[in-house]
Amino acid sequence: MKHFKLFLLPLLAMTLVFSSCEQQDLSLTYIEPIQDWGKSPQDILEKMTKSKSGATLEYSESDDGYYYMEFKSYGISQYLAYAFIDNKLVGCATSQSSITYKQTIKNHIDKKHTLIQVDTNEDYEEYLYCNKEKTSSILFFIDNIYGEMEQFYIPYIEGDIEDFWNALE
């Protein structure tokens, strides 16, 4: 029953995220999780700045190799963080809180490999959800006490899924 609940919660979270994007017209802020993997920072910037609605993009590169971006559209700010390894996109996080998204991306991606920690406490809940057939990627959600929803993509790792879970422990 516990595993069944863990399966349903991310599905509900996905519904909330995507319906929220439609209502606030923030869909432009989300990159395609599969199509954009391996792209350079320049490719991502070019794609984002070409988006419609007169959106603006401000970005900065930190010493640890992360790109922090603020995407503004329709008067709404959406904070983006992208991680690049060897000049290739390996992960991204989005949030409407600049503090939250920076901490998220630093906690779960480093310059050499992807780190994931699943935890639950009274402040937030983290879920890992693997939809191997549809997205070939891992979709990571955080739903904290402030009601913020974040989505976090990493590439799906080929091989036995049990080996993948064991590697995370």
Summary of predicted features, one role per range:
Residues V17-S19, A55, Y124, S137:
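Short intrinsically disordered, low-complexity segments
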Residues M1-S19:
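Sec-dependent bacterial lipoprotein signal peptides
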Residues L6, G38, Q151-I154:
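Intrinsic structural disorder/low-complexity segments
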Residues T94-E169:
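Extracytoplasmic electrostatic interaction patches
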Residues L8-L11, S27, I154-P155:
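Alpha-helical interaction segments
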Residues C21-D110, I157-E169:
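Short helix/turn-capping signatures at newly exposed starts of structured segments
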